[in-house]
């Protein structure tokens, strides 16, 4: 069982994936698949948090539960159509639900 502290640990350099690390970037699932591999986790043990349709497509193509956070001018409908499992209207709204999301995902996975 992993918590938010583990999320922060995973931000270490050895777990990062940049455009320079992959042959095909988003919307390909390759960036997220590489991230799973580097972190040593399965798709059902991860969560993607994205703010753009191409990132949502990438996360869902990697078969990872994908949360979209609308941080800009993109209509929420575009994030839904890209395949987001959940959409939050803002970062503050997402932040207000993080603990609940972690709890819910622990129960359902």
Language-model features, listed with the residues they occupy:
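Short, small-residue-biased leader/transition segments that mark boundaries at the very start
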Residues: 1-8
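Conserved acidic residues
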Residues: 5, 14, 44, 85
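Histidine/lysine/aspartate-rich catalytic loop segments that bind and position anionic ligands
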Residues: 9-26
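Short secondary-structure boundary segments
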Residues: 20, 70-73, 91
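Conserved Lys-Pro-Asp/Glu-containing loop-to-beta segment of HAD-superfamily phosphomonoesterases
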Residues: 25-53
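Acidic, Mg2+-coordinating phosphoryl-transfer loop and its flanking beta/alpha structural elements
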Residues: 47-86
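Short amphipathic alpha-helix with an adjacent loop that forms part of the alpha/beta core around
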Residues: 94-106
